[in-house]
Amino acid sequence: MFLAMNRFKIVKGREEDFETIWRERDTHLQGVDGFKEFNLLKGRSEENYSLYASHSIWQSREHFVNWTKSEAFRLAHKNAGKNADIYLGPPELETFEKTL
């Protein structure tokens, strides 16, 4: 099992905008080889931002990497540059492999 998480710092007061973007977007993940599960998680709120993480589970690192090179990935991220004003910076990718 392989887990990929992108952490997003969202400008305070723009949380609903961010959640709407994710609720309404097509992730193009269904049917992708090795894809298991996706969740959008909300974390702590700080003075000037709220923390979110997109959380996807894959059969293996190889499946995740293959997806990042696919047309499905390009389609899922085609509007990534829009709404830049709601982010405090670029997302931070963190990846994990199951050990136990």
Task: Identify the function of each model-found stretch.
Residues 2, 39-48, 78-100:
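Glycine-rich beta-strand-turn "strand-cap" elements at beta-sheet edges
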Residues 3-8, 39-70:
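Short, well-ordered beta-strand segments in beta-rich or mixed alpha/beta enzyme
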Residues 10-18:
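Short, surface-exposed ligand-recognition loops at beta-strand->loop->(often short) alpha-helix junctions
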Residues 17-21, 67:
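Short amphipathic alpha-helical coupling segments at ligand-binding clamshell hinges
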Residues 22, 26:
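Short amphipathic alpha-helical/adjacent loop interface patches that line ligand
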Residues 27-36, 57-92:
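An amphipathic, aromatic/His-enriched active-site/gating alpha helix that lines ligand/cofactor pockets
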